């Protein structure tokens, strides 16, 4: 274990590392596409309701089910209220909150890097820094307003604390961060603490007094955090609610057509494919880390204590993969909590691979070993990770049309005293949230081929933010079976604007006509959106110079006759460009 670095050099390292990571994460806050409708409807919309008194409501927020935490929403409302106090528009409030998420993620990642440098291995810390700097998976997850992203940051802090020498303080810190991530964020992230608990039992074997005192304090803090969360959520819902337990009940114990599987299932290899896209060869080094650690232990390359320490750090990655691979319902966001563990395992795997390679070369010929270009190989690995990650990030921008189109509605000349309806059909799941609409606009749904349940609307409220009626009133026409609710739809005649996506190969149906070719509507603003059916896989997954994507048209349509000041739209187009 390396000696501790001077406090001054560590503080300088923190400032520089945090600054670079913050800049990189802020690019995510500015440009990342919201690719999960759950993030919008279950988190951004309730946050908008808390801040402004109106927004869309999913069945999960009905007090009958209560599987979403208002405490989690309220925590993110703090920077929202600060941004409002600064006089920012609702769109800028959205990006301000994202910026706070970016900086918090950078803070957590910096703590992990310095913890690895102090207590583990400086070479691994360098590899970890490079992986985090250029990793497209972390770039996306860092600014997601999802409980799994929140849990990811808490796991990062817990992992940082775990790397310090054993003590009561370490145990309390690790348990506290895991509890915060599980109770306020996502309860399943608690499974990542299993290796640490086992390590503690091994370290304190036979010293029951120390074990009792250490864990008594840790459990007390965990219960305190849990009690605070239950209290806050119960105040919002106006009834006793333990949301984390409700989530577990719904996802694990639900029967009779309930549960997550009704929203779709994926094959066992889904996560390997997805992690390969998000982390490229970083995943390979992470997967190799476990076998390399076992090999090192069997060949006496590392002692038993080092083996236990390494195993407790990297095993959560494999445990998490196993747990979620066997679940039929799979989502990209379910992997977020292990992203920092994956990156650390990859850094360790890269370090051990290089050392193993050098050892093999030494056994062959010392001259060959001395000429082996270690630094060049490391730089090549970094370059491959960086190029693939940048290509992935750029490719995702091909889906950013909704983030451009919706704000442009505010440039259309409308009467601010009249509520306008912005309607969406098949594109309901790409809606970026009410933060992107003008103050006097409301999102409405028109019938499409989708036959599941769509969000309803919170009861609009002028009450103080902590006592809005939508928190505790039981809404009508909600169900947990994903059954279609016809009350969600509005007539096309009541729409003022319509958002649609059109491709050259689009075929009209009764419920999904090609609106731009109909008599009643005309597109007034169009933005390119990648055509995933006509673009080869490599062109969709990565920005490849020799593969030109095929494009569709993401459109704002208005009723005929058109009564719009087109100079405003031209100005909007220039600003977005």
Curated annotation (Swiss-Prot):
Its EC number is 2.4.1.259, 2.4.1.261. Its main location: endoplasmic reticulum. One of its GO terms (molecular function) is dol-P-Man:Man(8)GlcNAc(2)-PP-Dol alpha-1,2-mannosyltransferase activity. InterPro entries: GPI_mannosylTrfase. It holds the Pfam family Glyco_transf_22. Residues 1-29 form the signal peptide. The keyword Cell inner membrane does not apply. It catalyses: an alpha-D-Man-(1->2)-alpha-D-Man-(1->2)-alpha-D-Man-(1->3)-[alpha-D-Man-(1->3)-alpha-D-Man-(1->6)]-beta-D-Man-(1->4)-beta-D-GlcNAc-(1->4)-alpha-D-GlcNAc-diphospho-di-trans,poly-cis-dolichol + a di-trans,poly-cis-dolichyl beta-D-mannosyl phosphate = an alpha-D-Man-(1->2)-alpha-D-Man-(1->2)-alpha-D-Man-(1->3)-[alpha-D-Man-(1->2)-alpha-D-Man-(1->3)-alpha-D-Man-(1->6)]-beta-D-Man-(1->4)-beta-D-GlcNAc-(1->4)-alpha-D-GlcNAc-diphospho-di-trans,poly-cis-dolichol + a di-trans,poly-cis-dolichyl phosphate + H(+); an alpha-D-Man-(1->2)-alpha-D-Man-(1->2)-alpha-D-Man-(1->3)-[alpha-D-Man-(1->2)-alpha-D-Man-(1->3)-[alpha-D-Man-(1->6)]-alpha-D-Man-(1->6)]-beta-D-Man-(1->4)-beta-D-GlcNAc-(1->4)-alpha-D-GlcNAc-diphospho-di-trans,poly-cis-dolichol + a di-trans,poly-cis-dolichyl beta-D-mannosyl phosphate = an alpha-D-Man-(1->2)-alpha-D-Man-(1->2)-alpha-D-Man-(1->3)-[alpha-D-Man-(1->2)-alpha-D-Man-(1->3)-[alpha-D-Man-(1->2)-alpha-D-Man-(1->6)]-alpha-D-Man-(1->6)]-beta-D-Man-(1->4)-beta-D-GlcNAc-(1->4)-alpha-D-GlcNAc-diphospho-di-trans,poly-cis-dolichol + a di-trans,poly-cis-dolichyl phosphate + H(+). The chain crosses the membrane at residues 69-89, 96-116, 137-159, 177-197, 218-238, 281-301, 306-326, 334-354, 376-396. Residues 30-68, 117-136, 198-217, 302-305, 355-375 are extracellular. GO terms for cellular component: endoplasmic reticulum; endoplasmic reticulum membrane; lumenal side of endoplasmic reticulum membrane. Residues 90-95, 160-176, 239-280, 327-333, 397-577 are cytoplasmic. The keyword Amino-acid biosynthesis does not apply. It is found in: Endoplasmic reticulum membrane. GO terms for biological process: dolichol-linked oligosaccharide biosynthetic process; protein N-linked glycosylation. It is a multi-pass membrane protein. Keywords: Endoplasmic reticulum, Glycosyltransferase, Membrane, Signal, Transferase, Transmembrane, Transmembrane helix. Pathway: Protein modification; protein glycosylation. Belongs to the glycosyltransferase 22 family. Catalyzes the transfer of mannose from Dol-P-Man to lipid-linked oligosaccharides. This is Alpha-1,2-mannosyltransferase alg9. It comes from Schizosaccharomyces pombe (strain 972 / ATCC 24843).
């Amino acid at each position: 274990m390396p000696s501790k670095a001077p406090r001054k050099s560590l503080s300088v390292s923190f400032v520089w590392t945090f600054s670079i990571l913050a800049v990189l994460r802020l690019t995510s806050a500015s440009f990342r596409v919201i690719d999960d409708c759950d993030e919008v409807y279950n988190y951004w919309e309730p946050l908008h309701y808390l801040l402004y008194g109106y927004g869309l409501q999913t069945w999960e927020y009905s007090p009958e089910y209560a599987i979403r935490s208002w405490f989690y929403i309220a925590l993110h409302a703090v920077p929202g209220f600060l941004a409002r106090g600064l006089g920012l528009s609702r769109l800028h409030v959205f990006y301000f909150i994202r910026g706070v998420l970016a900086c918090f993620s950078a803070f957590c990642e910096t703590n992990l890097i310095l913890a690895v440098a102090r207590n583990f291995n400086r070479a691994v810390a360098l590899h970890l820094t490079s992986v985090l700097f250029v990793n497209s998976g972390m770039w996306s997850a860092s600014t997601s307003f999802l409980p799994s992203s929140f849990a990811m940051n808490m796991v990062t802090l817990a992992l940082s604390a775990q790397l310090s020498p054993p003590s009561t303080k370490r145990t309390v810190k690790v348990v506290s961060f895991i509890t915060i991530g599980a109770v306020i964020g996502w309860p399943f992230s608690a499974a990542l603490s299993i290796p640490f608990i086992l390590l503690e039992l091994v370290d304190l074997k036979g010293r029951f007094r120390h074990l009792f005192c250490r864990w008594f304090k840790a459990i007390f803090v965990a219960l305190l955090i849990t009690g605070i969360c239950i209290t806050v959520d119960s105040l919002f819902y106006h009834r006793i609610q333990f949301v984390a337990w409700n989530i577990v009940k719904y996802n694990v114990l639900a029967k009779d057509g309930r549960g997550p599987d009704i929203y779709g299932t994926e094959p066992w290899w889904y996560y390997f494919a997805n992690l390969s896209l998000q982390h490229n060869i970083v995943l390979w080094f992470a997967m190799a880390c476990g076998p390399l650690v076992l090999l090192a232990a069997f060949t006496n390359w590392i002692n038993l204590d080092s083996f236990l320490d390494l195993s407790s750090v990297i095993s959560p990655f494999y445990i998490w993969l196993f747990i979620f691979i066997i679940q039929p319902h799979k989502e990209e966001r379910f992997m977020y909590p292990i992203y920092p563990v994956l990156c650390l395992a990859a850094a360790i795997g890269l370090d051990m691979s290089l050392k193993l390679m050098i050892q093999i070369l030494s056994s062959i010929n010392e001259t060959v070993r001395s000429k082996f270009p270690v630094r060049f190989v490391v730089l090549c690995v970094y370059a491959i990770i960086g190029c693939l990650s940048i290509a992935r990030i750029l490719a995702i921008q091909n889906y950013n049309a909704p983030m451009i189109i919706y704000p442009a509605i505010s440039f259309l000349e409308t009467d601010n005293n009249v509520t306008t309806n912005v309607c969406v059909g098949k594109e309901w799941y790409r809606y970026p949230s009410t933060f992107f609409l003008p103050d006097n606009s409301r999102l409405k749904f028109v019938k499409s081929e989708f036959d599941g349940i769509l969000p309803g609307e919170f009861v609009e409220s002028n009450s103080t933010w902590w006592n809005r009626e939508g928190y505790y009133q039981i809404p009508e026409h909600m169900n947990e079976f994903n059954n279609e609710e016809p009350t969600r739809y509005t007539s096309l005649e009541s729409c003022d604007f319509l958002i649609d996506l059109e491709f050259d190969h689009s075929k009209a149906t009764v419920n999904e006509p090609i609106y731009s070719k109909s008599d009643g509507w005309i597109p007034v603003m169009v933005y390119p959106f990648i055509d995933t059916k006509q673009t080869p896989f490599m062109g969709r997954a990565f920005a490849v110079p020799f593969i030109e994507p095929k494009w569709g048209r993401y459109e704002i349509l208005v009723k005929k006759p058109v009564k719009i000041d087109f100079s405003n739209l031209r100005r909007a187009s220039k600003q977005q460009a």
